[in-house]
């Protein structure tokens, strides 16, 4: 019989507790990083918090009933832009595909990049507001003094007239806020003087 040293039960228990605590902390850090994209995905799928839907094609059903859509524009701190809708509101037939324009101008003396966030109020209507094309899908860079018109193509889903929460809505507000962003950098940049056809 050999005498092999054994780890006392108390030390083994402490090691398990330390390992569990480290795993818990690592899990919490991972959840913190995943929370924003998961919440964004949840809002886009459900229309929660007035988040609009992104679609590839227009509605094939157009109702005679009309709904008023008003447009709102805001600029977050740190972005010296003038940003506004070209028209304040329109009356559209439910299901009709419509294009409206927003206008942005860089008031600063250097290039500035921004990206727009958006929502629809009343919030219950967000799931029925479908965007086919929108400047909010990508970031926008404006040179000093540059002015740009930016289209939004959308329709209000005819299903909005069915649920109790949305069937009596007569006015929607589409609101955008532009926030400053660092411009995206290309994944692989070619240095000056280098050829692109390297082996």
From Swiss-Prot:
<dbReference type="Pfam" id="PF04442">
    <property type="entry name" value="CtaG_Cox11"/>
</dbReference>
<feature type="transmembrane region" description="Helical; Signal-anchor for type II membrane protein">
    <location>
        <begin position="13"/>
        <end position="35"/>
    </location>
</feature>
<feature type="topological domain" description="Periplasmic">
    <location>
        <begin position="36"/>
        <end position="199"/>
    </location>
</feature>
<keyword id="KW-0735">Signal-anchor</keyword>
<dbReference type="GO" id="GO:0005886">
    <property type="term" value="C:plasma membrane"/>
</dbReference>
<keyword id="KW-1133">Transmembrane helix</keyword>
<comment type="function">
    <text>Exerts its effect at some terminal stage of cytochrome c oxidase synthesis, probably by being involved in the insertion of the copper B into subunit I.</text>
</comment>
<keyword id="KW-1003">Cell membrane</keyword>
<keyword id="KW-0997">Cell inner membrane</keyword>
<keyword id="KW-0186">Copper</keyword>
<dbReference type="GO" id="GO:0005507">
    <property type="term" value="F:copper ion binding"/>
</dbReference>
<keyword id="KW-0472">Membrane</keyword>
<keyword id="KW-0812">Transmembrane</keyword>
<feature type="topological domain" description="Cytoplasmic">
    <location>
        <begin position="1"/>
        <end position="12"/>
    </location>
</feature>
<dbReference type="InterPro" id="IPR023471">
    <property type="entry name" value="CtaG/Cox11_dom_sf"/>
</dbReference>
<protein>
    <recommendedName>
        <fullName>Cytochrome c oxidase assembly protein CtaG</fullName>
    </recommendedName>
</protein>
<dbReference type="GO" id="GO:0008535">
    <property type="term" value="P:respiratory chain complex IV assembly"/>
</dbReference>
<comment type="similarity">
    <text>Belongs to the COX11/CtaG family.</text>
</comment>
<dbReference type="InterPro" id="IPR007533">
    <property type="entry name" value="Cyt_c_oxidase_assmbl_CtaG"/>
</dbReference>
